[in-house]
Amino acid sequence: MNLSELIPETHYIQINLSDLLDQLGEDEVKEILSTFSCPINADVEKFLKEKAIEFSKREFSKTHLVFWETENKEEKEFVGYYTIAYKHITIDRKAINYKEARKLREHGIYNEKSSTYTIAAPFIAQLGKNFSN
């Protein structure tokens, strides 16, 4: 028995909100988002319905919608979403040793004027399950 036999085939797909907007247009995407319901966390629902499109357009964050699809791929059900955002972290050069500074040079931007490194740190800004079904 190989590993693929042990792992069930998944029928979940993720679609980037920006890609969906390009393909379907804002009105149709808003219609899809309107089907989302999260009664246990109103902020999660409000973000998706009122801010996610604008945040995607302005590149503040990237939202991905998760759909379950039938085996024949004819039907899709909106089951949830997640949003990735970036926080910029500033680190004073004097607060770290040479080895750490060398690592930061690979991943961040050094500002000679302020003697600081700035790095982008991704985080899950929103995570929501659709309870409408």
Indicate residue ranges for each PLM-predicted region.
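Non-catalytic substrate-recognition and accessory regions of acyl/acetyltransferase enzymes
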Residues: 1-132
